[in-house]
Amino acid sequence: MSFVSKTIIEADHELRYLNGAELEILRAYLNSSEKRIKVIKTLRDREKEIISKASRKLFQIHPDYIGPGGNASGSRQRALCLRDYGWYLRLITYSIIAGDKNPVERIGLLGVRDMYNSLGVPLIGMVDSIQCLKDAALAELKSEEEVKLAEPYFDFVIQNMAQ
């Protein structure tokens, strides 16, 4: 659910108009729409470079993952790892435009711990991988304002995987 929808539903649940504070928050959100779109376009257009930088960093931190018997030792396993990077980056862009963590939570995090555990993927590696993805993605953004729009959603994914 988008930030706008959530705000409206909360007010309607209380059978009231949006108050002044809510309207100001909505104004700020709507005024940030161009920046949000710019951030999403940057992340989308630079996806390959972001994933490449993030994976290099992850495999520096955990060289055993690409060593014999590691979770990303073969080309197929490595391709799946890179696919997951792209998947999380895309889901984070959904949350950026919505102004809400719900898209990444609902689509990307429900049941993720169980799934990775069942596949034998170390959760610490997933936490580190999203941290590397965050670092690579935020490095592509041009301003602190853009970073502030994207960073909370990366942090949300990291925190949820770390629990």
Swiss-Prot record:
Localization annotation: Plastid, Chloroplast thylakoid membrane
Membrane topology type: Peripheral membrane protein
Listed GO biological process terms: photosynthesis
PTM notes: Contains one covalently linked bilin chromophore.
Keywords for this protein: Antenna complex, Bile pigment, Chloroplast, Chromophore, Electron transport, Membrane, Methylation, Photosynthesis, Phycobilisome, Plastid, Thylakoid, Transport
Record PTM N4-methylasparagine, positions in chain: N71
InterPro entries reported for this sequence: Globin-like_sf, Phycobilisome_asu/bsu, Phycobilisome_asu/bsu_sf
Entry GO terms, CC: chloroplast thylakoid membrane; phycobilisome
Binding site for (2R,3E)-phycocyanobilin: C81
Annotated function: Allophycocyanin is a photosynthetic bile pigment-protein complex with maximum absorption at approximately 650 nanometers.
Family recorded in the similarity comment: Belongs to the phycobiliprotein family.
PANTHER family: ALLOPHYCOCYANIN ALPHA CHAIN (PTHR34011:SF2), PHYCOBILISOME 32.1 KDA LINKER POLYPEPTIDE, PHYCOCYANIN-ASSOCIATED, ROD 2-RELATED (PTHR34011)
Name under which the protein is recorded: Allophycocyanin alpha-B chain
Organism: Cyanidium caldarium
